[in-house]
Amino acid sequence: MTTIEQTTVDEVVRGGIARGVAAIGLAGTALIHLLVLPGELSETPYIFFLFLALMVSSLALAGVLIRTGDARVWAAATVLAALVIVAYVLSRTTGLPQSTDYVGHWNDPLGMASLFVEGSVVTLGSTVLFARWVRSAAGAHAGNARASQPRGLQDPTGA
C-alpha cells in the first residue's frame, strides 16, 4: 500500500470514528432529555415540546451522521448541541419563561451528563469543521501557487 493510499484509509477510518462518536453523543442527548421529559408536560408544556423536538432532531442528525460526513450535517449537530448548552445555562441563571425552578440548580446529575455529552459534540464537531476549513484553505493556497507558476514549472503530480 502506498503512502497516499494509507493516508486515505487513515482519513476514512478517523472520519468514521468521529461520526460514530458524534452519533452516540447525539443519541445520548436524546436519552437524557427523554428521562426528564415526563414532568415537563404538566409543568411547562412548551419545554416538553422543545425536548421532543430536540430528541427527534438529535436522533435524525445521528442517523445522517452515520451515513455521511457532510459539513452541513456536522454544522447542524454542532449548533444543536451548542444551543442546548445555552438553554441549560439560561435555565440555571436567569430562568426560562414560566420556568424558574432550576435557577441556581447546577448540580443536577442529568444536567451535568447533558453538559458533558453536548460539550463533547460541540468540541468534536468544531474540530472536524476547523480541520476541513484548514485543509480547504491550504488546498486553495496550493492551487493558487501552482496557477501562478510559469507553465513549465508546475508540479505534474498536482501536489
Please give the residue ranges for each predicted region.
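Membrane-interface extramembranous regions
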Residues: 2-159
